[in-house]
Amino acid sequence: MENLSERFNVLQDQLMNIYEAAEQTLEAQIAHWLLLRKEAVLLYFARQKGITRIGYQPVPPLAVSEAKAKQAIGIMLQLQSLQKSEFADEPWTLVDTSIETYKNAPENHFKKGATPVEVIYDKQPDNANVYTMWKHIYYTDADDKWHKTTSGVNQTGIYYMQGSFRHYYVVFADDARRYSATGEWEVKINKDTVFAPVTSSTPPGSPPGQADTDTAAKTPTTSADSTSRQQRSPAKQPQQTETKGRRYGRRPSSRTRPQKEQRRSRSRHRTRSRSRSLSRVRAVGSTTVSRSRSSSLTKAVRPRSRSRSRGRATATSRRRAGRGSPRRRRSTSRSPSTNTFKRSQRGGGRRGRGRGSRGRRERSSSTSPTPTKRSRGESSRLRGVSPSEVGRSVQSVSAKHTGRLGRLLDEAIDPPVILVRGEANTLKCFRNRARVRYRGLFKYFSTTWSWVAGDSTERLGRSRMLILFTSAGQRKDFDETVKYPKGVDTSYGNLDSL
């Protein structure tokens, strides 16, 4: 215990010396993260031994110490790699190499020169959000070579240049869905308006199948599902009220009637799915029998029922029952199923009412068009991407506020590519010829590259090259027009970002 306390105190003294010196060298930052790693390892070891306090310092749980040690190792490896680049002699502060700056958007990049960007929604100064734009961003390419690039802002969002490609790490349309009611925003830097109010009812690259969801998401306190339910319910209520007025012609006899109606409505929703499956199974073997039972039961029982919330299937059965003659209704009211229904009504229990309503609903579900209409309406909001939309987007896909399904739909419209495999010189000659002969049939050509083994730097297989297109149609025209060299094979693909 004393040995651990002494080592911990030595680490604390060394950290304090680094903080007081505040050196702006990369060597000092590497030493700082090395001490943080040793501190996390020491606290992890102490917790394993059951020690909960070292001096005045409480020992955190094992998971916390393990996470901090892994963070320190990751940052230290990145700094050691940066030390071998041409940017090692630049001034580096504790803020520039902190984990908070490293994990800030864009994530896992070293950044310098923070500049606040204010975005005002709906022309209301109180409804604003502040983002960070970085003057310099450092990133590595596929060959682990460090590059230094600049960052910029436009009406779409904040980006940094990766070669000739704009990589957006902040998209204003994502937060406009939450904070804006009209879909307008204004971009300001240092209190100067850079871009006038921009209107975006649907964010760029959003598939048409999500139009309803995006529109509903503009209201902050209302979800898409609740909005769709509120829009569908007013259309059903007048029909139910009108039917009840024609059918019964009187008001509820007590104050507890609305509560009973709510309980019956909830029971109807709980038993709807089970009644559908049972009715489908029965309809396979005895379609005629189920229809005759539904007709006789509907005509005999519905005049005596006092249920107030039954939906469109019940209203349809009532109208059909109303067309029958009184004589026929009297003759069919003596059926055994009617007596069963009366016994369930006299029971008065919530459970009995649920079974009675479910039985009636099972027999009349074969003539009800409601499930088909409802499923059709729900599936229209989550339909897939049409073939004409595939390959339309050429921007990075946003992962915010869309969910897994929304991201899959967004990625379905990513720009298509063709992967070409062959000898390096053959691919280079093919690229040079295609630039001259087939201009306009493609967007970009990549340089030749190869896969590398995980435990060495040895190149695996033949060289590869990517060809980018703006749409699937352009890729099809290119593939049908171009004659590939001998020994070269191709395959299709899509990328979520360039």
UniProtKB/Swiss-Prot annotation:
An example molecular function term from Gene Ontology annotations: DNA binding
Purpose: Plays a role in the initiation of viral DNA replication. A dimer of E2 interacts with a dimer of E1 in order to improve specificity of E1 DNA binding activity. Once the complex recognizes and binds DNA at specific sites, the E2 dimer is removed from DNA. E2 also regulates viral transcription through binding to the E2RE response element (5'-ACCNNNNNNGGT-3') present in multiple copies in the regulatory regions of the viral genome. Activates or represses transcription depending on E2RE's position with regards to proximal promoter elements including the TATA-box.
Bias kind Low complexity: ranges: 199-228, 280-298
Region (Disordered) location: 196-399
Post-translational modification: Phosphorylated.
Compositional bias annotation for Basic residues: 265-279, 301-332, 343-361
Name under which the protein is recorded: Regulatory protein E2
Protein location: Host nucleus
Matching Gene3D superfamilies: 3.30.70.330, E2 (early) protein, N terminal domain, subdomain 1, Papillomavirus E2 early protein domain
Binding partners and assembly: Binds DNA as homodimer. Interacts with protein E1; this interaction greatly increases E1 DNA-binding activity. Interacts with protein L1; this interaction enhances E2-dependent replication and transcription activation. Interacts with protein L2; this interaction inhibits E2 transcriptional activity but not DNA replication function E2. Interacts with protein E7; this interaction inhibits E7 oncogenic activity. Interacts with host TAF1; this interaction modulates E2-dependent transcriptional regulation. Interacts with host BRD4; this interaction mediates E2 transcriptional activation function.
Keywords noted in UniProt: Activator, DNA replication, DNA-binding, Early protein, Host nucleus, Phosphoprotein, Repressor, Transcription, Transcription regulation
Chain spans, region DNA-binding domain: 414-498
Signal peptide: none
